[in-house]
Amino acid sequence: MASGKPVLGICLGMQMLGLRSEEGVSDGLGYIPFSMRRFRLDDYPELKVPHMGWDRVEIVQRDAALVQGLEQPSRFYFVHSYYAVCEDERDVLMGCDYGVRFAAAIHRGNVWGVQFHPEKSHRFGLQLLTSFSRG
């Protein structure tokens, strides 16, 4: 990370960028201060865990390089049981609602993370990965 080269964590890769998770006792890498929490959707019987399938995301930081060219709202493919809660809202790049509002994508400095799977997300994912590769 110190080299300044861009880093992109996808799904579990994003989760590892944070501080901690309710899932286990090991700390995360701590590159971005956030925690992972398990979905507790007792008040939403129509919603299942894991959160699986296509969902809309809201781009919060429109000027960030990673989201250039993306439609608003965009749709991405998710498969996860834990969601990110950032300590600093300025680290939230994209948000999503699934019983709770969570950070679907995060960014700080040269470190980027996405909870969804861009490689499974058709034109939206292709645009995001293209933007990342162009820096």
Show which residues each predicted segment covers.
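Amide-donor transfer/coupling interface in amidating biosynthetic enzymes
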Residues: A2, S35-G135
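Cysteine-nucleophile active-site neighborhood
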Residues: M1-M52
